[in-house]
Amino acid sequence: DRNGENPLWADNEPYYDDFYAIWDTYRTSSPLITLIDPKRETDIVRSLINIYKRDGYMPDARSGNCNGRTQGGSNAEIVIADAFVKGLEGIDYELGLQAMLKDATICPGDRHEAEGRGGLTHYLQLGYIPYGIPRAGNRTVEYSYCDYAIASVAKGLGKEDLYQHYLKQSGNWKNLWRDDYEHAGAKGFILPRDEKGNWLDEITFGKSNIQKPTFTYTPVTFEGPWYTPWWDMFFYEASSWEYSLSIPHDVPGLIEKCGGAEKFEARLDIFFDRGFFNVNNEPSFLSPCLYHWLEKPYRSSDRIHEIIAKNYNDGPIGLPGNDDSGAMSSWLAFHMMGLYPNAGQDYYLINTPLLEETIFRLDNGKTFKISTQGLSDKNRYIQSVTLNGETYPYSAIRHKDIITGGELILKMGKKPSEWGKQLLLNEENEKL
């Protein structure tokens, strides 16, 4: 917190300005801070909102008192929604919603690479961003996710019309979903589309006197030719294989687009077994946990432990990629404890931990303990769970159930069990 050192304005609000970048940190770093130091996360969120108030837009990246490059969506919206649904107090969420709505409605002009939503006019008119605008693919996907974040805050503040509008808009990722495209045994991918709605099998990266300027685009296309900046790709730092599985706010909708549970499970297996999963970057962070939505949380745990064993160690190069302001190490920390957040929502997925016991010492003076019984390399499957002495059948736990204190006990065994077939129930007693 650099309050008092800010040369641009003086007030009593916290001032954090080293965000590098929220695209990296919103998935794991921010949720971990919320869990272990909620006062700090409250100040960070207040700072984001105050930057909007004083400087015009919340940042995606910021350093040296200036908003920097946007990478995907206007991801500060997810940070605000995450704080809101987890009940962090002392934040002006009405003003926060104003900041979110400015991102979602006001074009940032020639600052579109530094703040706000680039390609916003097309997104609002077409429901997607057409190829030719940098990062059209992941911007469409992430704006949809950010719209869900807006809907969540609007609903909590009693703004029903806004809630319905942005909930509907959060489905815009489907407008780039090409149902008939097949690759490596999977069908349906997020792929380039032009302004007229045509799907593009061939794309132009730019003009060159050396190389052919038109290339076939496939779900494994990751980089362009040498003369193309990496930030001008259809997806930012990822492939369609990765982003077509990165719909954290609507996993049931994703499963439906993939052809149902059986085909989705087969697709996940192809994703991991064929090497399309990228351990060293953020777009795939949630993917190992997607088996939870198939009533098979034990398969999520198997994937997670395999990934950690192959890619993490305690040597000088112990992380598989850039830590990105704690994003990579926070992913590991959560999985060592047996929890994993779905940012912008109020729950954590439960997996087999690597640690026999974890104790959270909460701000309210209480503690929350995660304990295991019989955990070993052989006994790696959860057989049953109790929360504060009561049978707990769900494979996720709400934030409020952690911060009120208590104990989650995981009984382990050698074989997969029937535990955890239900993720959680929402307010309408429907499956998440």
Task: Give the label of every model feature segment.
Residues 1-16:
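Conserved oxyanion/phosphate-binding beta-strand-loop segments in alpha/beta enzyme cores
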Residues 13, 27-30, 63-67, 82, ...:
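Short alpha-helical segments and helix-capping/turn motifs at coil-helix boundaries
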Residues 26-29, 41-51, 64-72, 83-86, ...:
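Mobile, glycine-rich extracellular loop/lid and propeptide segments
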Residues 1, 31-34, 42-45, 59-60, ...:
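Short, solvent-exposed loop/turn and secondary-structure capping segments
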Residues 15-27, 36, 73, 77, ...:
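Active-site core of glycosidic bond-cleaving carbohydrate-active enzymes
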Residues 48-54, 58, 63, 154:
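Primarily short, surface-exposed interaction patches in extracytoplasmic proteins
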Residues 350-432:
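Beta-rich accessory regions
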Residues 43-46, 55-59, 75-78:
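Active-site rim segments in enzyme catalytic domains, especially the processed small/beta chain
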